[in-house]
Amino acid sequence: MTTTATVTTALNHVELVYAPGERALARALFELLGCGIHDSGGPFLSAKIAPGQDTLVNNAMYASEVTPEQWALEQALRDALDGGTLAAPGGDYIANLEAHPQRSCHFGISYPSAEELDATIERIEHAAEHTPGLAGRVSVSGVFRPGDPGSYTDTMTQAFIRTDVIASGLLAFGQHIELQWQVA
């Protein structure tokens, strides 16, 4: 008997950055999301989306410290956002992202059950109790269940978290991560 594997195209990883000295916070955030962690001490901190998976090649997130060039840009951008020339438009942009997280640049993680999704949301809502460094750094922007006001679909529950600990891009604007459970 011959077994043939079906080859599919899939998103295999998300590359993220964290601020200098915040590797432990990035790890704590991955743990809140329910990820399995692999940290060899090298430049990359790896998180397996499904903790029991065998490989770090697919279904993974990688995080590394920002480059010095990005950190210099981040600092200049934060200065401009904090009372500088970008304060008003930056504030409006971030407020809109928080009000309508479905419209933000984000990536999603699917959970196998509504209970696992709800447990993850609960961990995030109480993150500061377990990791004080995450206080004010990760929050739930919104939870949209089928039929709820603001829900875009009846096929899944979507929860959006916002963090400035990790980002796939600039940390100054934060990162939204969609957590979802798909209705069977």
Predicted regions and their residues:
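Short proline/glycine- and acidic-rich turn/helix-capping motifs at secondary-structure junctions
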Residues: 137-154
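Acidic, proline/glycine-rich low-complexity IDRs
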Residues: 149-184
